[in-house]
């Protein structure tokens, strides 16, 4: 597995500025939409964070929630709707739900951080990345380690990836309780930790934890900072 700095995905300037679902805080923009992503880039974001879900006809769309109630006021699940039905929906600020392919095509220089939400979303997400030849500008992640590993195994070439929750917790236990024993094996197939500052009693934002991760060629990205 190539180390982090061998991937063009990590060549952006520091500090990394990830736009969580695009410029989602803007009063006139919807989250996870092409205008929201473009606005984030216009405001100096170095990376775009988004989520993939699968439609009923197995197309990867950029959408966070399982259903459309919060952002569109519709009591329906993304997985139950066809792409045509998804495209007919307008979000609360008039935005349209994009496919992953549309986003990769519309923003050809943008670097995407993709959280694969469900098992059915794996195949269409990989298909969109492969068709766009976007391996060098996409990082694949998931809260589910089996989903993350399945996605990586389905790709035709290596791609940047971040650790799942279980990976991060394992690394923290190694660092905090085992004096780093086993840390290298835990992070051998990840290039970044994407974590909250705190989770329950655990404080991830310590100099020692960040330093240990960086010594193992693992970047640390905190979410969310200013939402």
Which sequence ranges carry the predicted segments?
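Phosphate-group recognition and catalysis centered on beta-loop-alpha active-site segments
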Residues: 1-227
């Amino acid at each position: 597995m190539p180390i982090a700095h061998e991937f063009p995905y990590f060549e952006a300037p520091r500090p990394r500025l990830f736009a969580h679902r695009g410029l989602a805080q803007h009063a006139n923009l919807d989250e996870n939409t092409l205008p929201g992503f473009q606005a984030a880039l216009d405001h100096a974001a170095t990376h775009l964070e988004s989520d993939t879900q699968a439609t009923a006809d197995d197309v990867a769309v950029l959408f966070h929630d399982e259903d459309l109630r919060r952002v569109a006021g519709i009591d329906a699940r993304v997985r139950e709707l066809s792409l045509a039905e998804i495209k007919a929906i307008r979000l609360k600020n008039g935005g349209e739900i994009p496919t992953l392919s549309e986003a990769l095509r519309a923003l050809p220089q943008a670097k995407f951080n993709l959280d694969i939400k469900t098992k059915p979303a794996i195949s269409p997400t990989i298909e969109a990345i492969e068709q766009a030849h976007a391996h060098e500008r996409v990082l694949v992640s998931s809260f589910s380690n089996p989903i993350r590993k399945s996605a990586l195994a389905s790709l035709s070439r290596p791609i940047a990836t971040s650790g799942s929750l279980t990976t991060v917790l394992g690394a923290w236990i190694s660092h905090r309780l085992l004096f780093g024993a086993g840390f290298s094996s835990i992070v051998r197939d990840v290039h970044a930790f994407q974590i909250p500052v705190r989770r329950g009693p655990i404080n991830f934002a310590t100099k020692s934890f960040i330093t240990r991760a960086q010594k193992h060629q693992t970047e640390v990205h905190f979410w969310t900072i200013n939402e």
